[in-house]
């Protein structure tokens, strides 16, 4: 679901400025550890992190992959990410501050694994397809892609959509459901698309057992973890 007011690129960059970066640093690292554990990663893997943010995830990846490259359009996030890289002495880590389509033009067929964690909800539909296709192009044939994002069918997201008791985060301009996210991946050329509904990473994770209930279960499926593959041929 897309917000009613359409923000231009500069407005969105301002939303992801210093204040947002500082707020983001307070998020629980456990959610990233849980997501990494869901990925099929090997020591020989070359990884690209689309919308890498502050790159807290490199703490869990730098010693178990061949290389990691993060790309983000926010200079503030890239500065924080580079400071983290230096503090961790992560020599196999690199960051690039640019758009994903621009990054893709000079990184085609370059990575075994790509992921976009909590990125898609920050991008409008009319831009997202181009970005998903660019991410697809960055992967080598047979490469694996992982997407993590809020689920638009989750009860709390429904409430935000209608401004009922709780408002949507201003940065979350396009929260989608499983069907919509899968469609974008399919159009880009991905195959073997698999959707898993996983718990929220805060106190709301306590609602997840209710996701098994008939008829109303979908309203308690907080997060999406989607796996897809770039065809070999």
How would you describe each model-predicted region?
Residues 173-188:
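Short alpha-helix
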Residues 118-122:
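Short catalytic micro-motifs in class I SAM-dependent methyltransferases
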